[in-house]
Amino acid sequence: MKKLTFEIRSPAHQQNAIHAVQQILPDPTKPIVVTIQERNRSLDQNRKLWACLGDVSRQVEWHGRWLDAESWKCVFTAALKQQDVVPNLAGNGFVVIGQSTSRMRVSEFAELLELIQAFGTERGVKWSDEARLALEWKARWGDRAA
């Protein structure tokens, strides 16, 4: 069976999903899994994230170091999720155990953008046009901005 995904935004979408489930013939030897969850972050949210991370990476020195956008992403997701740190395999450093942003729900991703905005604003980051528009859009539309 192929994977089906329904984004439910209206009663019509809901009925389409219900109809699809009703068409499945149950087979005890091949169970089907139905998952209902909030949508993961959108590509638009991801683009906004990288615009903001790029601005922070170019303008904020962190404990005497300039971090790239990818490293800042790790710092922010660790702060948001209060993640753990474990020694690396060689024993000469540490690894942050955390959550991938691609697996974040829309609301979690919105929290991440809010955290980055607050952090950057506290440190005087001058937001690029793309990041500024992303943050203004988030402020205006909230979680619906995705």
UniProtKB/Swiss-Prot annotation:
Pfam families: NinB. Disulfide bonds: none annotated. It comes from the Bacteria. InterPro entries: NinB_sf (IPR036619), Recombinase_NinB (IPR008711). Belongs to the ninB family. This is P21 prophage-derived protein NinB. The lineage of its organism: Bacteria, Pseudomonadati, Pseudomonadota, Gammaproteobacteria, Enterobacterales.
